[in-house]
Amino acid sequence: MIVWDLAVVGAGPAGLSAAYAAARAGVRTLVLERAAHPRYKTCGGGLIGTSLAAVRDRIEVPAHDRVDRVTFTWDGRRGFTRRHRAPLVTMVRREEFDDRLRAAAVAAGAEVRERAPVRAVEQDPEGVSLRLADGTTVRARTVIGADGSSGVTARHVGVRYRQVDLGLEVELEVPPEQQERWRGQVLLDWGPLPGSYAWVFPKDDRLTVGVIAARGEGERTREYLRRFVDRLGLADAPAAHDSGHLTRCRADDSPLRQGRVLVVGDAAGLLEPWSREGISYALRSGELAGAAVAEGDLAGYERAVGERLVPSMRAGYRLLDLFTRRPEIFHGLVATPPGWRMFVRFCQGRASFDETLARREVRALLSLLERIPASRRSVPTS
């Protein structure tokens, strides 16, 4: 039986980043993917600057729009639009973006095996066995799990979650006049449910329209999406895709490794808690894990995540708490020049949330706001 140096479970941005980093360093790498590229993935598909930097030397990003304008509303009211001189977010379709990452991993030397779902993970002193759906077994010295938060590797490692949200999304086909209306612009709507928001992301002849809210509010979340689409005048637009998924943010003490099995991206619960942005965390954690395997220092992956990713997640939880308790204050802050600058820096990858919140004036403001009681969840009247 072939024994691979590394087997990666899952061929999304996290898994393919791990495979690319490892294979490029000479690690004999196999990627196991349950589907076949190109495949649709429920995702807003907005790449912030941090994500663009992570793939700059790897692929040409298949951009369908570059956004420089953002309209903010609070449950459809009190809207305002801000514009920046340079693009803030790059829009991609995940089937194209992921397929380019796959090609880059293959070019680096990795083998990608598609339609190969993994059903079980077992470790022994010599390595790791992966049992596939067809009954065959793959052996590897090390495994990186990138099969999502509900996958077998997350269960094997024992990942624990602090926050679970339900995201619902429709991909709407729109005529030329709607394409022109939305070109270069996104809409973010702070929603009526605690911690919820909705978005419109333009991608040429399609609009990705979605909402996200805490799990357990399924019916109200679906109603929020329906009302949001109606309000946009898009209720009759044909849907190319209509889907949903759960996003899970890790608990602070959740493991990232069990023996010779590491988890990355969604499988590790690595994403930004306030925006639920996950692609940048997937790309970075995958690269960190692949490099750790190449260097023979698996514990180094845990250290790197703790140093480079966890601080921003902790800051994101503080922002989410303020947003959940007082969305009207959050809406007002984004309208101010300092609030807009913070948003721009986040989008362009020029400053992480922990770096921003560490500034003295921001610390003082946040400390004051955190002492304000939570508001009643009311719809704005003007």
Regions found by a protein language model. Name each.
Residues 15-16:
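N-terminal Rossmann-fold NAD(P) dinucleotide-binding loop
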